[in-house]
């Protein structure tokens, strides 16, 4: 995972005002080493989630689907199949601290179906409880 792109996505997740809660996610589509589109999780529903949600109750927009949707405004589906997707999750630690740690951002089954269907080359995600040094994201 490219550390610069990862840090951009972590900042995007932290700044996401569309969700309130213990965790936030952001995803990025990377084409030829460049971040070309991003997406964040949202409480807003979206028609794409009816197709790619993991079940019929999973209607809220996932970061991966949002990033794919935004990428398809810029590139063709054929070009998308040459892209990577990066997914980051940040969460508050279990100890009640106000900082952020990385969380497991492995795509759900619905998002993984979308990633596979659109032919994305590689998938990168953050792992659980990796301390984000002392950086404060507000």
Stretches found by the model and what they are:
Residues 1-24:
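Short, basic/aromatic recognition patches
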Residues 21-38, 124:
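Short beta-strand scaffold segments in enzyme catalytic cores
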Residues 38-138:
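Zn2+-dependent cytidine deaminase-like catalytic core
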Residues 1-9, 35-46:
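Short, charge-rich amphipathic segments
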Residues 6, 21-23, 28, 69, ...:
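Functionally constrained cores in energy, signaling, and assembly domains
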